[in-house]
Amino acid sequence: MQDILKKYGDYLVPVGILIISLIIYGTLYGNPKAMFWDENYHIASAQKHIDGVMYMEPHPPLGKMLMAVGETVVGANKNIDKRALNETDYLTGDAAPAGMRYTGFRLPSTFLMAFSVLFFYGIVHRITRRKWVAAAFTALVIFDNAMVIHSRSVMLEGIQMFFILGAIYYMVRVITSGKRIRLPHYAILGVLIGLAIAVKLNGAILLLLFVMLWGVDQWQNIKQLKWLALLKRLAVTVPAGVVPLLLVFFGIFYIHIGMGTEVVNNRTYKASPEYLNYIRKGETFSPSAFMVGMKDNWRYISEYADGVPRLDVC
């Protein structure tokens, strides 16, 4: 038995962790059979993606897109009329169609969070080089009741956590590999950060990972104050990381804007006449429609943020 553990321990431990995580997070995740927390908002938004209805909201669209994919794949409500979801941004329990199930909408958050524990395990294992230490710390994530309840709902955090931990794990893996840090490493990190930001804008805090990666990459030049070498490296690493990030972020918005081919109940979200005209003409995937739609979406996000009360602890 000890020989098996020594030979396959590097694989058995994370596999065991994943199995436990899937059981904890995935068992009966369709319960409760009613909406709670922000599910009332996100379910309505996800359904609009399925039906091609234009909408805007304060968060980028990737999370709702994945919820729409989950609902489509599971198909638990394929025989239910869900048109009421397109007529509101907040679906009350009374307005929800009778017999509606939430397993499809909850699928991405539940299982992406369940799988993200592998990234967390990998981060701690890479740092400590002790698989049992990594397993012990990972257990804190798996058995955190608040995290489990939050992730088993139609919420954005479980989805975003997958990309956040994925980005951190990738950075840790690169800097602990002992190999030279190359431009593709910055690019892949940029993709992962872009995905996290495309779920919620607060993912922009992960831009600090670029600074950390560059610091490790150029540590010798930093110690020796080789300013010219540092600037030359910055000139190539910044585009290498930021360009993929922007392509991911704006690419997701391009799909989001293109999918919005219909306005329901005159819910225009203060869209400009130019944007509405592209929708009427069925040209939402055109580059010009994207430019106008992106500007309108960003304005909506900014105006919504301006209306949020500022934290005052005094």
What feature does the model see in each segment?
Residues G99, T103, L107-T128, G166-Y170:
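Transmembrane-helix motifs of polytopic, lipid-linked glycan transferases
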Residues F36-W37, A146-Q160, V199-N202:
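Short acidic/glycine- and proline-prone juxtamembrane loop motifs at membrane-interface regions
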Residues H125-T128, A167-H185, A196, G215-I222:
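Membrane-interface transmembrane helices that cradle and orient dolichyl/undecaprenyl
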Residues G9-E39, D51-G52, V242-G260, P273, ...:
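Transmembrane signal-anchor helices characteristic of membrane glycosylation enzymes that use polyprenol
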Residues N79-T92, F120-F143, G178-P184:
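Transmembrane-helix signature of polytopic, membrane-embedded enzymes
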Residues V53-T110, L276-C314:
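Interfacial juxtamembrane loops and adjacent helix segments
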Residues I17-S21, F137-I142, I149, Y169, ...:
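Short helix- or helix-capping micro-motifs
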Residues M65, L195, W214-C314:
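Transmembrane-lumen/periplasm boundary regions of multi-pass, lipid-linked membrane glycan transferases
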